[in-house]
């Protein structure tokens, strides 16, 4: 399939990927030095880039840290991804599925759709053997020549189509097994139920004190779920 991909298909992908980027994505050429925020016309030139805008899921990306990562989707009988960006040295890869309909994740969004997407993400992560600690903020830029990039001639995926390839009913309910968007949903529920009960105790201290305590509760919730540290930005996003 990859050998038959035309230059026009690649150009169409780059145009579509660029259009869906945040206006000012996080990006980097070396994650060891952290990430910076730049206009997307600059960020698209970096090796690593934030692919989903704030509060909107346009693509699902999975981090597979093993030498045969390229074949993980095929071995798991999953649908063809939209792209794969592979490390030329060790074979590790990011596998991306672009969504036909982006999913809003704000408090105004439909919670059942978010939970549906989270279950799909969890099921794919398990099937692919992807890294559970990957938060989904930054990806290997599939438009950058550092990586061995493979663009597949497929249309963006509907959620229902993605769900047809996995059994959502068989997912584990243990929150410690949840990662990515599912972890954010679980953290949100845990923290909001605490907040409903605790807000009265913080009314006299002002917003800043209240906000700091909510973030602290989110950190504690995350540590309880996954047992590892998450980027501070993830706490702020769900809190």
Give the location of each predicted region.
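Modules that initiate DNA replication and primer synthesis
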Residues: 100-103, 162-239
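Short C-terminal domain-edge/linker segments immediately following a structured domain
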Residues: 90-96, 125-130
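Catalytic "initiation/cleavage/transfer" segments centered on a nucleophilic residue
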Residues: 8, 35-40, 44-47, 114-192
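Generic detection of long, well-ordered alpha-helical segments
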Residues: 110, 114, 118, 208-212
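Hydrophobic, Leu/Ile/Phe/Ala-enriched alpha-helical segments that form helix-helix packing faces
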Residues: 74-78, 120-132, 214, 221-225
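A generic structural motif
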Residues: 83-90, 136-139, 232-235
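Signature for HUH/AEP ssDNA processing cores
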Residues: 1-93, 99-115
């Amino acid at each position: 399939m990859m050998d038959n991909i035309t230059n026009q298909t690649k150009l169409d992908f780059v145009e579509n990927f660029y259009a869906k980027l945040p206006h000012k994505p996080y990006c980097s050429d070396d994650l060891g030095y952290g990430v910076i925020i730049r206009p997307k016309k600059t960020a698209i030139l970096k090796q690593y880039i934030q692919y989903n805008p704030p509060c909107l899921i346009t693509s699902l990306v999975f981090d597979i840290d093993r030498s045969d990562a390229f074949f993980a989707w095929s071995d798991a009988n999953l649908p063809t991804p939209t792209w794969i960006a592979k490390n030329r040295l060790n074979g590790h890869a990011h596998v991306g599925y672009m969504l036909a309909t982006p999913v809003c994740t704000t408090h105004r969004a439909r919670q059942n759709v978010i939970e549906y997407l989270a279950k799909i993400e969890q099921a794919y992560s398990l099937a692919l053997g992807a890294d559970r600690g990957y938060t989904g903020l930054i990806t290997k830029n599939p438009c950058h020549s550092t990586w061995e990039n493979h663009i597949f001639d497929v249309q963006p995926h509907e959620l229902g189509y993605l769900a047809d390839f996995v059994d959502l009913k068989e997912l584990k309910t243990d929150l410690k097994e949840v990662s990515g968007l599912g972890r954010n949903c679980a953290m949100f529920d845990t923290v909001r139920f605490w907040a409903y009960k605790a807000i009265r105790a913080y009314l006299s201290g002002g917003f800043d004190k209240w906000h700091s305590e909510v973030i602290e509760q989110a950190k504690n919730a995350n540590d309880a779920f996954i047992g590892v540290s998450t980027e501070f930005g993830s706490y702020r996003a769900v809190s």
